[in-house]
Amino acid sequence: MKRVRKLTRGDTFSLEVEITENGEYQTVDKMFLTVKENYSADEVLFQKKIGDGIELKDNKYLISIYPEDTNDFEYKQYVYDIEIIKGNIKKTLEVGILRICDEVTFAVDEV
């Protein structure tokens, strides 16, 4: 079963990823959160990577989605995955649905 994450369009959203092996915290060389319209789409709608939306803090990777990432999205479901690379090992940690939900206060209303 795929994980469903709900996000109000134009809001800030964060998620934490903890990587452990035998109870020990691990770091990775690369991490990506990639969002597309559907699984067969070539176009990446937005992507986060270490140093650009993903930070290591207190042994956890914090992935941040900012308002500008989803301001122009339609209210519907998109797909995402979280992938890590460490040395020559590549692993997808999570594949899921990003459901963009209705908003009432639009950016132009924030005066």
Task: Give the location of each predicted region.
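Contiguous segments within soluble domain cores/interaction surfaces
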Residues: 1-111
